[in-house]
Amino acid sequence: MRIIVITGMSGSGKSTAVRALEDEGFYCIDNLPMRLFRPFVELIEKSGDSYRGIVLVADIRGREFLKGFENTFQTLRDQGHGVEIFFIDASDDVLIRRFSETRRRHPAEEQCTVSEGIRIERERLSTLRQMATRIIDSSDFNVHQLKELILRIVRGEDAETPMVIEIKSFGFRYGIPLESSIVMDVRFLPNPFFVPRLKPGSGLDDEVREYILDNPKTATFLDCFFPMLDMLVPAHRQEGKYYLTISIGCTGGRHRSVAIAEATAMYLRADWPTVRITHRDIEKGQQ
């Protein structure tokens, strides 16, 4: 029988995942004591009901579960059951924002801040996270996107699903994009803003782009930046990310960041075909 354990951080989207799997025909149960789990699996098998499998939800509330899961899972695997562990995570900033929006108390402790509760929860779930067969980062997902991803995974449709990479140029004077996973500051590069004939243009114009990219300082930077992305992008994919935002900023978001963002997108498309590019502040920088 297929057994999926849904676990992870509070506020990461476990309830969304469970609802998706329930609609998909799985029998879902929340925080079943570990000593009852093996008898429960046997009971479902003997019932003859046509469930696609069992989903067990485990989180920080199930102290008994967290103590006994390792031996139980291994026993079930030895009996021929397919046991998968989906650990759903999100960045601390995203979790704090979600708790703020819902006005819920963090379940880790009665009296502590949300950020402290998140720290405690990460410590308690660290072993389970290491055991996970799938780590899913929901930081960049809305409810519908997370549900779609969970269904693709359980249907075996996600193996060929590439990570969507968004390259976003921006101006620091207008703020760093909140959705950023990686932020690169290129304000140290030569600035066309101070060249009268180039100032009215943007990083999309050939003359402006050549002024930036042909500079030796830019060449040295890209020789370091691109190999770094060759390491970072696959690492984010392995951590369960299906969306990655790489934000590149200069002062106004019109010249340097645009040119470097275009060069970065061109470089990454060789290995990651789903690269898209957005120039958030290119028109603001004209003002």
From Swiss-Prot:
Domain of life: Bacteria
GO MF terms held by the record: ATP binding; GTP binding
Keywords noted in UniProt: ATP-binding, GTP-binding, Nucleotide-binding
Claim: Ligase is one of the keywords in the record: no
Keyword hit for ATP-binding: yes
Residue numbers binding GTP: 59-62
Residues that coordinate or bind ATP: 8-15
Function description: Displays ATPase and GTPase activities.
Family, as annotated: Belongs to the RapZ-like family.
Name under which the protein is recorded: Nucleotide-binding protein Ppro_0977
Species in which this protein is naturally found: Pelobacter propionicus (strain DSM 2379 / NBRC 103807 / OttBd1)
Organism ancestry: Bacteria, Pseudomonadati, Thermodesulfobacteriota, Desulfuromonadia, Desulfuromonadales
